[in-house]
Amino acid sequence: DCRNSVVREETGSEIKNNEKIREDSPCLVKIPLFLGGFKKRSRYMKEYQNISHGFGPVYNRESRILILGSFPSVKSREQAFFYGHPRNRFWKVLAAVLKEDEPETVEEKKEMLLRRGVAVYDVIEQCSIIGSSDSSIKDVVPANLGIIVEASQIRKVYTNGKTAGKLYRKYQDKELNLPMEELPSTSPANAAYSLEKLTEIWSRAIVEV
């Protein structure tokens, strides 16, 4: 019976009922690492990678506020746009603040931001990071936010979460010299804040739009 016979190509371990299977056994089934995925993901999530931001800010001449995250998550880097994780509540919260329908596509998100005077980017342009872990960030190269501010009407900065706020104060505050308010993170990792609570706090803070 070959039903329980499996080998993982990346480890070379062959097990059937706790016994070794010969390499030439007809029961041997090889599962490549890129299909199994577990060890590859584990290594990826545990290793530092030095990564550039990968996509540009959203703003125009009419932008009045700037919302900053820390650095794009893995999902955002894959989609080449902000807050790409399906459980991140940024777009739900911002749409509620602006009294807009929640945008679904990247183009709809851009259109809403530009029409409502909201610029979005991140504090960091390049860094070493493990996966999406803000706490692992090191080797920081700050983003050139001055370009955004000079080409717009931005008068206030909001940071999405404590890490973004901390990084902003360390790398950007003196350069931009704008009022900044730190808002609770919309990340799914911030489980202490419900969608309703986030929306309430963000709505009280953001009045310029």
PLM region spans:
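Residue-level detector of structural "landmarks"
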Residues: 3, 7-9
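Internal catalytic-core helix/loop-beta-alpha segment
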Residues: 115-163
